[in-house]
Amino acid sequence: MLKFLMVLFSSLMLNACSDHQAERVHFNGTDVSNAEYAKDFDLTDHLGQPRRLADYKGKLVLVFFGYTHCPDVCPTTLTDMTKVMKLLGSQREKVQVVFITLDPERDSRALLAKYVPSFDATFVGLYGTSAQIDKVAKDFKVFHERKNTAGAESYSIDHSAGTYVYDQSGKLRLYFKYGQKPHEIANDLKMLM
């Protein structure tokens, strides 16, 4: 009898472990659910409204840092986000894409209002003072450095490129590296919905 109970207990434990493994979700992006950074932002959107992460509660929020004069990474990422929204179909209503400028000197409210919605009318561009942008970038662990080129007003900004994803409650969940495929991003977002 004791042998039977031990076999029964062992099989129940194995079953419980395998059920737990079946519940694990495998994301294409990096799971950063336990990160202790990138908690919030306090900036202004391209319509002049003050914005915080909590303003988008109830939606998945994708946050990307860049600048409007960026020749490659930023427009590519925003184009990929447009593709993600198309792949989501009607579920796109549950997602908010947020672009935070790293170039407050050139990226005015008016410029952001033209640039960001040109990719998708629902995308939001955020800006602030240099001090505000530096503070938010530091909190999000986003590297950015101005690189002067020919001419006084001609410069580029080297910056880290990736997208943060928050769930509907405002908790940081995923990080997508630059170049992550739109279908992979869309699949991960569907798993979070």
Q: What function would you assign to each model-found segment?
A:
Residues V73-L88:
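Typically the conserved alpha-helix immediately C-terminal to a functionally engaged Cys/Sec
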Residues F4-L12:
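Sec-dependent N-terminal signal peptides
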Residues A113-S160:
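Short, internal strand/loop/helix patches
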Residues V95-R106, F123-A131:
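Thiol-based oxidoreductase modules, predominantly thioredoxin-like and allied folds used
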Residues A22-A54, T79:
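N-terminal "domain-start" segment that seeds a small globular fold
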Residues N15-A16:
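C-terminal motif of bacterial Sec signal peptides marking the signal peptidase cleavage site
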Residues G151-M193:
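Thiol-/selenol-based redox modules, centered on thioredoxin-like
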Residues A54-P75:
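Short active-site neighborhood of thiol/selenol oxidoreductases, capturing the structured segment around
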